[in-house]
Amino acid sequence: MYVPLEISVKDVEKTKQLEDLIRTKAEKLERACDHIAGCHVSVEKPQEHVKSGTPYRVRIDLTVPPSHELVAKQEPGQGEMHEELDQVIRHVFDKAERQLKKLVSKQREASHS
């Protein structure tokens, strides 16, 4: 992967499996857009108790030249109650990929105008 990838984890065990999943998903983003300047993935399990939805917070911040900042996230309380962390990560990366493809499409249209 050529994109500078930063992974921060809080109150969740940082396993090789977790890191590999994030790296694989980030590489997929790079295939959607080959000029990502930065990718920061934050994964945490806040201490507050959630009555519904996932207990995890996952956020992806992407920097795309010339000056675009894309954010895809899922907050505690969103999604399914017993959703596993890997499912939440996949879901948020899917959101990021949709945003990225939309941006790339707009950039292509603008360059052909």
Label the predicted regions:
Residues M1-S113:
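N-terminal, polar/charged subdomain of small-to-medium soluble alpha/beta proteins
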